[in-house]
Amino acid sequence: MCFSQAETLVNYSFGTCQHRKIFPHFFPSDLLGNKFLPIRGVPHRGPGCYIAEESKDLAYSLAKIPTSIKGYGFGARTAVRFKPKNKDVTPYPGMYQTVNLQEQTHKPNFAPFNTLSPRFRTYSKDPCYPGPGTYKLEKKEPQKVTWPMKFGSPDWSQVPCLQKRTLKTELSTDKDFRKHRNRLAYLSLYYN
């Protein structure tokens, strides 16, 4: 008698009499459920029969987000990581590059030496900064120090010097005098 009941139960596999959550309509709250979302909506409805406003509704987005019932499981998240892009609008030729009324200039943080400086510098028109045509090229200054000479040797009578002293030590005034004399000889190159 026990064997006859066992033979009748063999036709059914374990758990088939109960209502089971199968994948295409239900999903687990882990990594597999986040990757493969279940089918939602009415199965006999065609692709052009959906309402576009329904996809932007709060209730629709809450129903679409996979959530974890028992806290956070391994790989389960409360929201989709990458949201799907809206493909309702077909791009037209002018959509790829938008028209910017204000031209944007991007200044890089680091650049090679002297590449960020302007190409042509702007100089002021002040009379302190003369232009290229304002110089007098007719007058050429001598580049040699003029020194009083007599037959190839210096004319010491025309060179200013101090009176002779019996003491051979050099005083600070003598040193200043020689500095002043040498400066005058140098400046006579440029100013006569």
UniProtKB/Swiss-Prot annotation:
Molecular-function GO term, any one: cytoskeletal protein binding
Superkingdom field: Eukaryota
Sorted UniProt keywords: Cilium biogenesis/degradation, Cytoplasm, Cytoplasmic vesicle, Golgi apparatus
One of the GO biological process terms: cell projection organization
Subcellular location: Cytoplasmic vesicle; Golgi apparatus, trans-Golgi network; Cytoplasm
GO CC term, one of those recorded: ciliary basal body
Main location: cytoplasm
Alphabetized InterPro entries for the sequence: CIMAP3, SHIPPO-rpt
Protein function: During primary cilia disassembly, involved in cilia disassembly. Required specifically to control cilia retraction as well as the liberation and duplication of the basal body/centrosome. May act by stimulating AURKA activity at the basal body in a cell cycle-dependent manner.
Oligomer status and interactors: Interacts with proteins involved in ciliary transport, including ARL13B, CETN1, KIF3A, RAB6A, RAB8A, TUBB1 and TUBG1. Interacts with AURKA.
UniProt cross-references to PANTHER family, sorted A to Z: PROTEIN PITCHFORK (PTHR31508:SF2)
Protein's UniProt name: Ciliary microtubule-associated protein 3
Organism of origin: Bos taurus
Lineage of the species this protein comes from: Eukaryota, Metazoa, Chordata, Craniata, Vertebrata
